[in-house]
UniProtKB/Swiss-Prot annotation:
Disulfide bonds listed in the record: none
Function recorded in the entry: Part of the ABC transporter complex BtuCDF involved in vitamin B12 import. Involved in the translocation of the substrate across the membrane.
GO biological process annotation, one example: cobalamin transport
Organism: Salmonella newport (strain SL254)
One Gene Ontology CC term in the entry: plasma membrane
Entry's family note: Belongs to the binding-protein-dependent transport system permease family. FecCD subfamily.
Annotated GO MF terms: vitamin transmembrane transporter activity
Protein name in the entry: Vitamin B12 import system permease protein BtuC
Membrane-spanning ranges: 15-35, 61-81, 88-108, 112-132, 146-166, 184-204, 240-260, 274-294, 302-322
Family annotation (Gene3D superfamilies): ABC transporter involved in vitamin B12 uptake, BtuC (1.10.3470.10)
Keywords, sorted A to Z: Cell inner membrane, Cell membrane, Membrane, Transmembrane, Transmembrane helix, Transport
Assembly with partners or alone: The complex is composed of two ATP-binding proteins (BtuD), two transmembrane proteins (BtuC) and a solute-binding protein (BtuF).
Record membrane topology: Multi-pass membrane protein
Length: 326
């Protein structure tokens, strides 16, 4: 038993080290790649000062943080709702952020600055989160809370569709592209959004013990002494914050929160002490690579990153499911 535990620990360490190395390599690729390839040796030149430090670096940092946030949100939701199909958009939080953003564009008539739009997106996500907490205070079961989140997401999606369909505002029509996900408008002015993500990401990565208990099921978690109502509310708020900030920076991006935790579990990383940092690293890698593809796939335009993540990720996910079923 001791030998097996040591082997498992070494295996987990190897996984985390490998993912950390891949994050570094993906970051280097993201900083170099673009319409003009800029090798690391040219980063201190005048061209590198503009393209790498002013354009690509803030974008790369945003992609890293959003990828980690979405993957961690998926891992938390899958443990919280005991459902491997749970993901950040499932509770309607992503759509709530979109409704907040669209309301800001309509009420501000396109005159609000970017930071104000970001705050409205976060506010929309947190409003949906507070509504979910209202349901949670009624001590609903996890399955009922999940259904409530799905219903809220449908309502928010309908509101966004109606607003965009009847709008003549060019800014609002541009939001349709934004809601597909993209980092094209990210620069150092969005650094406050990046900073807002970091403490929550670190805190979530340290919550392996309650999440391990929650993954055992509600009954087992109660028997182990976990204050279920408190932790469920706290984790829903943290997830709402991460998703709201992510949507404010990059729009709605699917696949990452659903598939990354599932892939790591299929690879044997089931303990949240390893799964949480693993999800943060793997989510950052996946979104960085998808962002590079989105930038380079077309010569004259940039693909929505949400389209890239779904196109690249769905076949891999199906292959892993078929492999695990054999």
């Amino acid at each position: 038993m001791l030998t097996f535990a040591r082997q498992q620990q070494r295996r987990n360490v190897r996984w985390l080290l490998s993912l950390s190395l891949l994050v570094l390599l993906a970051t280097l690729l993201s900083l170099c790649a673009g319409e003009q390839w800029i090798a690391p040796g040219d980063w201190l030149s005048a061209r590198g000062e503009l393209f790498v430090w002013q354009i690509r670096l803030p974008r790369t940092l945003a992609v890293l943080l959003v990828g980690a946030a979405l993957a961690l949100s998926g891992a938390v939701m899958q443990a919280l709702f005991e459902n491997p199909l749970a993901e950040p958009g499932l509770l309607g939080v992503s759509n709530g952020a979109g409704v907040g953003l669209i309301a800001a564009v309509l009420l501000g008539q396109g005159q609000l600055p970017g930071w104000a739009l970001g705050l409205c997106a976060i506010a929309g996500a947190l409003i949906i989160t507070l509504i979910l907490l209202r349901f949670a205070r009624r001590h609903l079961s996890t399955s009922r809370l999940l259904l409530a989140g799905v219903a809220l997401g449908i309502i928010c999606s309908a509101l966004m569709t109606w607003a965009i369909y009847f709008s003549t505002s060019f800014d609002l029509r541009q939001l349709m592209y934004w809601m597909m996900g993209g980092f094209g408008g990210v620069d150092w002015q969005q650094s406050w959004l990046m900073i807002a993500l970091i403490p929550v990401l670190i805190w979530i990565c340290c919550q392996s013990q309650p999440l391990n208990m929650l993954a055992l099921g509600e009954t087992s978690a109660r028997q182990l002494g976990l204050p279920l109502w408190f932790w469920r509310n706290l984790l829903v708020i943290a997830t709402g914050w991460m998703v709201g900030v992510s949507v404010a920076m990059a729009g709605a991006i699917g696949f990452i929160g659903l598939v990354i935790p599932h892939i790591l579990r299929l690879c044997g990383l089931t303990d949240h002490r390893v799964l949480l940092p693993g999800c943060a690293l793997a989510g950052a890698i996946a979104l960085l690579l998808a962002d590079v593809v989105a930038r380079l796939a077309l010569a004259s335009a940039e693909l929505p990153i949400g389209v890239v993540t779904a196109t690249l990720g769905a076949p891999v996910f199906i292959w892993l499911l078929l492999k695990s079923a054999r």
